[in-house]
């Protein structure tokens, strides 16, 4: 089983997500990540990947996979904020040293 860690930024974003159906889908995708099923994931850059959830606004969860053992959920957003979210995820990864 893969260990999943989350930043405070990601946890707050998910807790404040008003779209309950999307929140449930994101939580299900995270459970699948734990089992090793990454599904629709795209490499963005600098080791950061984008987990795409096709629900509501088209949500994205940005993560860093460390040797397939630990996945760190950095931040998230929707298709509209994608460009800024990628920059934020890369900065968080550098800040965390991952």
Question: What are the roles of these predicted feature ranges?
Answer:
Residues 1-21:
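Arg/Lys-rich, positively charged N-terminal/basic patches that mediate binding to nucleic acids
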Residues 3-4, 23, 38, 56-60, ...:
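Enriched for short, Lys/Arg-rich terminal
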Residues 8, 24, 28-31:
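Internal, well-ordered alpha-helical scaffold/interface segments
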Residues 16, 32, 64-66:
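Conserved catalytic core of Hanks-type protein kinase domains
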Residues 16, 54-57:
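Membrane-interface junctions
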Residues 28-54:
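A short, surface-exposed loop/turn module that caps and links secondary-structure elements
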């Amino acid at each position: 089983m893969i260990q999943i860690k989350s930043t405070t930024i990601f946890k707050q974003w998910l807790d404040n997500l008003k779209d309950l159906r999307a929140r449930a889908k994101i939580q299900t995708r995270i459970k699948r990540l734990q089992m090793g099923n990454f599904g629709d994931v795209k490499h963005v850059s600098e080791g950061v990947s984008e987990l795409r959830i096709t629900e509501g606004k088209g949500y994205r969860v940005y993560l860093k996979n460390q040797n397939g053992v630990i996945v760190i959920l950095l931040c998230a957003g929707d298709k509209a904020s994608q460009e800024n979210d990628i920059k934020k995820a890369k900065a968080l990864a550098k800040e965390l040293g991952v």
